[in-house]
Amino acid sequence: MSVSGYPRHRPRRLRSTPAMRRLVAQTSLEPRNLVLPMFVADGIDELRPIASMPGVVQHTRDSLRRAAVAAVDAGVGGLNLFGVPRDQDKDATGSAGVDPDGILNVALRDLAEDLGDATVLMADTCLDEFTDHGHCGVLDGQGRVDNDATVARYVELAVAQAESGANVVGPSGMMDGQIGALRDGLDSAGYADVAILAYAAKFSSAFYGPFREAVSCSLSGDRRTYQQEPGNAREALREIKLDLDEGADIIMIKPASGYLDVVATAAGVSPVPVAAYQVSGEYAMICAAAANNWIDERAAVLESLTSIRRAGADIVFTYWAADVACWLS
């Protein structure tokens, strides 16, 4: 029993029914906000499950086409492709990524033909999947990543991906000057309409672990000389501003859940859309907890994605994109 006139403010009034909660919801989660990362492997004739990411697979070309159409039909906003070449096709400079007949470029052409303007087709513009050393760039004589040689290679990758039908290229290697160089290279090659998704703040994270299996990466060492330190928020803001100055069309924060402060900061300063990537480790943690019946998988997924949206992400990359689209329909 309450004292007359107290409490005057009762926020619970706006939580009283599902209809009321929907009406006053401040954050929405819709399939159109989501991008589905997909892996396509060369030299396989059936799906290859990724053990550390239950439910995620390396696709064949044919299975990729079917899964992509299904995701788009479900309402997923975009698709982001990663190519996985055969081990014997990897080399020091990632030639398979530039080759028009390389698995990623062939798969881009497949999906561009199948889907046309029904989706936004994105490509990972990086070398780690294609190099025999597993780094995101070209190495110099001392085994260090050569920034400028790598950027030149990224331009070749981006042009090859644009030629193959990518609407958006995503340089994810965190090289200095990569966005400006790609913009110049794409424009010079006649692809002024191809957008650049800049991985503006990509942190050196332990949560990328399962992804290395997903792309069959052979990395030795780490990527701390080019990916950002997890504790450096002001450095992230500097990187964001540099990429915006160089012409980024969309900026990416990666990973998402551990860096929601950076997502919020980016959303506060960016005149272009902000994306955030719910990475493989985030996915694997929820899967593992759900498999042990410690959490409700669907509820946890929707809560995590809503949190990323609440922080300010316009676009969320998630391996649950197709599932969520079905759940929300």
UniProtKB/Swiss-Prot annotation:
Subunit structure: Homooctamer.
Entry keyword annotation includes Transcription regulation: no
Residues reported to bind Mg(2+): E239
Binding-site positions, 5-aminolevulinate 2: S280, Y319
Enzyme superclass (EC): lyase
Catalytic activity of the protein: 2 5-aminolevulinate = porphobilinogen + 2 H2O + H(+)
One matching Pfam family: ALAD
Active site per the UniProt annotation: K202, K254
Gene Ontology MF annotations: porphobilinogen synthase activity; zinc ion binding
UniProt keyword terms in alphabetical order: Heme biosynthesis, Lyase, Magnesium, Metal-binding, Porphyrin biosynthesis
Involved pathway(s): Porphyrin-containing compound metabolism; protoporphyrin-IX biosynthesis; coproporphyrinogen-III from 5-aminolevulinate: step 1/4
Species, as recorded: Mycobacterium leprae (strain TN)
Binding site for 5-aminolevulinate 1: R212, R223
GO biological process: protoporphyrinogen IX biosynthetic process
A GO-annotated cellular component: cytosol
InterPro entries documented for this protein: ALAD, ALAD_AS, Aldolase_TIM
Presence of the UniProt keyword Magnesium in the record: yes
Protein name in UniProt: Delta-aminolevulinic acid dehydratase
Function: Catalyzes an early step in the biosynthesis of tetrapyrroles. Binds two molecules of 5-aminolevulinate per subunit, each at a distinct site, and catalyzes their condensation to form porphobilinogen.
Family assignment from sequence similarity: Belongs to the ALAD family.
Assigned EC number: 4.2.1.24
